[in-house]
Amino acid sequence: MDLDEPRITGNIKEIKTGKRIDNLDMNKIMPDFFKTETENLKIINNSKNVLKKLSKFLQIIVLTNLPHKDKNKRVKALQRNDMNFPVITNSGLKGEAVKKILDKTKIKVKSFFIDDMPLNIDSVSKESSDTVCIHFIQDKRIKKLMPTPKSATISFHNWLDIENFILDNLNDDGEKETQ
């Protein structure tokens, strides 16, 4: 994989030839990848412990743009890592889904949204302006290609910083901070 741009299509190369895989081939490869590898994806450093700790104070929900038919594979992968959180599959921008989730709560709650994709951060910020939007990219190679969107409350590169930020901001008035 080359990381010339912050996307998968165009950055995947054939191992033997080094030739980039074109869009039509990617449309065939990606469904197979989700089908065979979703259950095998490794968790990110510190994510398990941080989410378990935060779950004492917050309802953790995994909102993923994984194909709906592969949802149970994601659930199994999380459960295998002792991360028993609800999983909701989505297609497209995540703002509307977050708004629907929050609209279902009977009381006003403090909400945090963590994502790597700037368009999802923008979408959630627009649809649910009270939500604290955290732009998270752990891989420094990708961070160089994907700047933090202006709509993000803050940006982090590791889960321990996210944990500290959320714990520090559970009971404040939700004013956006910059860093």
Where are these regions (language model features)?
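Conserved phosphoryl-transfer catalytic core
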Residues: M1-D32
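Short, acidic loop-to-helix structural element flanking the phosphoryl-transfer center
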Residues: R20-N23, P31-I61, H68-V75
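Short coil/turn segments at beta-strand junctions that form active-site/ligand-binding loops
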Residues: L58, K108-S111, T131
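A short, structured active-site edge motif that brings together acidic residues
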Residues: L63-H68, V75, R80-A97
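Short acidic-hydrophobic, aromatic-tinged amphipathic segments that line or gate anion-handling sites
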Residues: P86-G92, T153-D161
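Short, charged, surface-exposed secondary-structure boundary motifs
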Residues: G95-K100, I142-S151, F165-L167
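Conserved Lys-Pro-Asp/Glu-containing loop-to-beta segment of HAD-superfamily phosphomonoesterases
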Residues: G95-S125
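Acidic, Mg2+-coordinating phosphoryl-transfer loop and its flanking beta/alpha structural elements
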Residues: F113-I114, P118-H157
